[in-house]
């Protein structure tokens, strides 16, 4: 095989030129710089430069800021008008945006850390609104969950899974993280969750985001949490925790209806339930049951069935509708797989919680911008809107390109027959 070398400067990541153009045309640089404190005259790079450089690392196939230095930097610096900071500057800029952690002590005397970054949280929603991914005249479904992020940092702690790390609480709308608070790895999911949700709902109201429905697992099944959720949305759906009182009521149910949910048949029923005492407010408990696999009798229900309950204030919808709606939260849980493996949540760069919180929110913005890009390209039939970032890179980003000068004009030359010039037109 004969080989010849060429010194011609070809950028193998030509698609990033079009991503940068969208970034500028949408006004994201000015939004970012306006929303965050200025870096001052002594800094060569603005936060908008730092943000897009970090995002570009993911869009080009990297997973950390150091990839800018070792793999992509020279190619990115060849793009006219793109100021590309080094990895050190990118990381230093994120550290500047860190907020002070809050320390609380539980009734059992255990200290918990929580990191609330209001400027970054507000910017996340502003970016999503700017992209058209969130709108003021829509009632959204909110999913809330905690995600264990395994890591060994100075302030990471052992979780209940016996894995060291952080345990952030994350609000999700339409497959996007929209609010993030970082927490100690050992913190119980219910510990001060009502305060986290109250802050999230307050921020949503300030940004004009309406929450119509809330959907949560049994980690949100407590009186304080339910009161906060009910006060801030129209209807909620929370997985109920079984207890002796609930099982007593289930035994009294005589009318069950057989319904096909997904690919399986279940028996379903609804009852009025007072989870916090007969003198408190009653809710609707939607129950499903199915035979267990081993046929073993349950001591309390006196049958060989598996029971599951959903607590809700929705008295109008059919049981099947409520169950299918709740089961759809599995799609929201897949968001964590995407954030972990495509946008760096499984590789936290800093040694302190507050700095890693900035990173989590910044990469959530990166994910939101990516969602905007692929949905727009999907309308031009480049690919499906739900593709993972690896296919996006292969299908759009990795194309040979070169900036040339003709008639005193800079022209981007693409070595492909694909109509890149029409991609976002």
Residue ranges of predicted features:
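Anion-binding and metal-coordination hotspots
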Residues: 1-10, 30-425
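Conserved oxyanion/phosphate-binding beta-strand-loop segments in alpha/beta enzyme cores
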Residues: 10-31
